[in-house]
Amino acid sequence: MATKSCELVLCFFVFFVISFSAISVSAQTCDNTTGTFIPNSPYDKNRRLILSTLASNVTAQEGYFIGSIGIAPDQVFATGMCAPGSERDVCSLCIRSTSESLLQSCLDQADAFFWSGEETLCLVRYANRPFSGLLVMDPLGAIFNTGELNTNQTVFDIEWNNLTSSMIAGITSSSSGGNNSSKYYSDDIALVPDFKNISALMQCTPDVSSEDCNTCLRQNVVDYDNCCRGHQGGVMSRPNCFFRWEVYPFSGAIDQINLPKSPPPSVTSPSPIANITKNDSRISGGKIAAIVVVTVVTIILVVLGFVISNRRKQKQEMDLPTESVQFDLKTIESATSNFSERNKLGKGGFGEVYKGMLMNGTEIAVKRLSKTSGQGEVEFKNEVVVVAKLQHINLVRLLGFSLQGEEKLLVYEFVSNKSLDYFLFDPTKRNQLDWTMRRNIIGGITRGILYLHQDSRLKIIHRDLKASNILLDADMNPKIADFGMARIFGVDQTVANTGRVVGTFGYMSPEYVTHGQFSMKSDVYSFGVLILEIISGKKNSSFYQMDGLVNNLVTYVWKLWENKSLHELLDPFINQDFTSEEVIRYIHIGLLCVQENPADRPTMSTIHQMLTNSSITLPVPLPPGFFFRNGPGSNPGQSNSKSFACSVDEATITDVNPR
């Protein structure tokens, strides 16, 4: 009896080893037809950056991630995917090793992909052009097992054709919803009489349509049949689809396949693998490795621990977009010297900003959300959602984010010259801003807002335009920053209302403060205030004496308009390289932007035309909103002409301080 028990245990162990023995197939496909890049160029740095963060993004996004980084022509698009059901750590390891293999194999190709499988199947792809939703059939990666079938080919073909056809039909007719790795995935097994089991796996990237997935997989099967019929297995891979079959179970599929009742196959070593080159692509391939056999108890414990950990993590995670890049917290801590004081750039309403440097030499600015700010989580999520979809030279570029434990971090490009208010309102630094520079700054801000309102994929209202949210690069070009308050509008939407007024006093439009109503014209009002501040070098929140009365900047400029003395507004630090007509025209446009009625304010498109075409006749402005006038004995914080009652969230009202 004891002998039989031992035999049963031994048989189970042998079957367990056979079932989990696997072959690892790898083929880096570097496309030589879509261009090359210079090593260590901006494109190469962006490529390395997005691939270095791909593993954390894939594991955070249900096993599938697609996104981009940089601005054309150095923009890099990338995607990563693991087979459904892959353990988080296994998936992460596969993506990391696959990315590293691509970096080592494709030294200067601007487009490459790699389906790799050891403990699981995973895909990594990058390109210099958008590819989401596009079916790409070239190049083809092909590998076949050199071992011969040595069976009745006719009988085998019937089973093989039935298996592949049913798998394709099943994938494309009953795909799961959403963009995740299980959308187009199938693995199955078939028994060939008097032969071994056929194990097969098929997968498409979830961004393509079911029709495109069908086309891609069918072509993979046809290509295998044309090149490799009669062999004991093989792989056909394209950028959007993958097909593999073997005469033994293999990684990426073994956990999902239900083995039919049949005699266990004989234990034989897999035959060598051959590589095929097609469509001017370079394929390196073929490595064989055995998966370490672990006990059933260990597997149960690992799976149980993973499920518990994953459930806890899901409760903490926020629904963030797949366009953005997720950084590991340790990477950010290392880049900022663990958020040291000497790296601190400034402090805002919801946290602090630090300068950092990544391992590849890229300088970054890290916005660290305050752990005590309950409202800040909403703004954090909002900023990632909004900025991830934007690409413009006059908008600060979001490189990614980190969301681990209590830490919520936004990673931006580093803009070297701080913010506009750092220069504009400093009595010694503002003399660096001559008229040409101020005019260029106004023009850049105009183009940035116009992109948000009209030219981007989304219609976005910033809601917090102010001098401290305009960053200046090394050439003093403006970049609009801080999208925590921004809102996305529908295509036909023009106005929205909120019960929670956020922003900065002095820049907020009257209808927003009094009624919570905001629109593109709210941003226009803020932009008008910015124009007046840039030309005068004065803060709108300060108070100015005129005719024995106390005025804010907008009211002060309006009185200058009425007295036909707008030239008095000009900052005395501006040099003589300007014409009074041009400066007065800019002030005139600023007054048009701050008119009380939103309908009277021009759109950003019209403003851009007014600024760039001096032949356009400007309409006469009407009195501004928040027309502010106090007697010398009055409290400057109270208006004699109008009073406003509103509920304003104090945590969202920010001071105008350098960042």
Curated annotation (Swiss-Prot):
UniProt cross-references to CDD domains, sorted A to Z: Gnk2-like, STKc_IRAK
Cytoplasmic topological intervals: 309-659
UniProtKB keywords: ATP-binding, Glycoprotein, Kinase, Membrane, Nucleotide-binding, Phosphoprotein, Receptor, Repeat, Serine/threonine-protein kinase, Signal, Transferase, Transmembrane, Transmembrane helix
Keyword check for Chaperone: no
Protein kinase domain ranges (all copies): 339-611
Residue positions the entry lists as glycosylated: N32, N57, N152, N162, N179, N180, N197, N275, N279
SUPFAM superfamilies: Protein kinase-like (PK-like) (SSF56112)
Catalytic activity, as annotated: L-seryl-[protein] + ATP = O-phospho-L-seryl-[protein] + ADP + H(+); L-threonyl-[protein] + ATP = O-phospho-L-threonyl-[protein] + ADP + H(+)
Domain Gnk2-homologous, chain residue ranges per copy: 28-131, 137-250
Gene Ontology CC: membrane
Residue numbers bearing the Phosphotyrosine modification: Y412, Y512
Residues annotated as the enzyme's active site: D464 (proton acceptor)
Signal peptide: 1-27
Name of this protein: Cysteine-rich receptor-like protein kinase 18
Species the sequence originates in: Arabidopsis thaliana
